[in-house]
């Protein structure tokens, strides 16, 4: 099994509702390790660049507005098959379809405020990690 890194973002709704510790517990209980973490307030420009892949989708403006509405916590997770493992822990994008025992299944109610973001591929994980972290921050 491959040791991988992936990006996690605890979105403004997770920070606002004070459930970041609970989410971190789900992450760590799965065997993934948090090797870098910082709280930040995304600028509109940062959010637009990060979610650029969605720029032509009807929800893009709402997504950017939401992601800049409060603090987020960006994290780098490491472990065996970290990308797919974290996606399993997060649960389905739509919380109504997410299994109980997943972050979204247990803590989210709405697809537009679904608590967390996780990289969807190893290639995107590398890009997303580099967007937020310098190599020297990954210890």
Swiss-Prot record:
Please list the residues that bind ATP: 11, 59, 87, 93, 104, 114
- The record's gene field reads ndk
Task: Please cite one Gene Ontology biological process associated with this protein.
Answer: UTP biosynthetic process
Q: What residues make up the catalytic site?
A: 117 (pros-phosphohistidine intermediate)
Tell me how this protein assembles: Homotetramer.
Class in the EC hierarchy, top level: transferase
| Protein name from the UniProt record | Nucleoside diphosphate kinase
- Give the superkingdom in one word: Bacteria
Describe the task this protein carries out: Major role in the synthesis of nucleoside triphosphates other than ATP. The ATP gamma phosphate is transferred to the NDP beta phosphate via a ping-pong mechanism, using a phosphorylated active-site intermediate.
What is the reaction catalyzed? a 2'-deoxyribonucleoside 5'-diphosphate + ATP = a 2'-deoxyribonucleoside 5'-triphosphate + ADP; a ribonucleoside 5'-diphosphate + ATP = a ribonucleoside 5'-triphosphate + ADP
Record GO terms (molecular function): ATP binding; metal ion binding; nucleoside diphosphate kinase activity
Family of this protein? Belongs to the NDK family.
Needs which cofactor?
Mg(2+)
Q: What is the lineage of its organism?
A: Bacteria, Pseudomonadati, Pseudomonadota, Alphaproteobacteria, Rickettsiales
InterPro entries, per the entry: NDK-like_dom, NDK-like_dom_sf, Nucleoside_diP_kinase, Nucleoside_diP_kinase_AS
The protein's Enzyme Commission number: 2.7.4.6
According to its UniProt record, where is this protein located?
Answer: Cytoplasm
Please classify the protein's predominant subcellular localization into one broad category. cytoplasm
Entry GO CC: cytoplasm
**What does the UniProt keyword field contain?**
ATP-binding, Cytoplasm, Kinase, Magnesium, Metal-binding, Nucleotide metabolism, Nucleotide-binding, Phosphoprotein, Transferase
Origin organism is Wolbachia sp. subsp. Drosophila simulans (strain wRi)
């Amino acid at each position: 099994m491959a040791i991988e890194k992936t990006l996690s973002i605890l979105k403004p709704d997770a920070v606002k509702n004070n459930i970041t510790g609970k989410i971190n517990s789900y992450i760590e209980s799965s065997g993934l390790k948090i090797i870098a973490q910082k709280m930040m307030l995304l600028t509109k420009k940062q959010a637009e660049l990060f979610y650029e892949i969605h720029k032509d989708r009807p929800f893009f403006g709402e997504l950017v507005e939401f992601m800049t509405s409060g603090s987020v916590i960006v994290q780098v997770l490491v472990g065996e098959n970290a990308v797919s493992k974290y996606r399993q822990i997060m649960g389905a994008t739509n919380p109504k379809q997410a299994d109980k025992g997943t972050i979204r299944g247990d803590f989210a109610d709405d697809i537009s405020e679904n608590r967390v973001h996780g990289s969807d591929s190893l290639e995107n994980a590398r890009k997303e990690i580099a967007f937020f972290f310098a190599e020297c921050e990954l210890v």
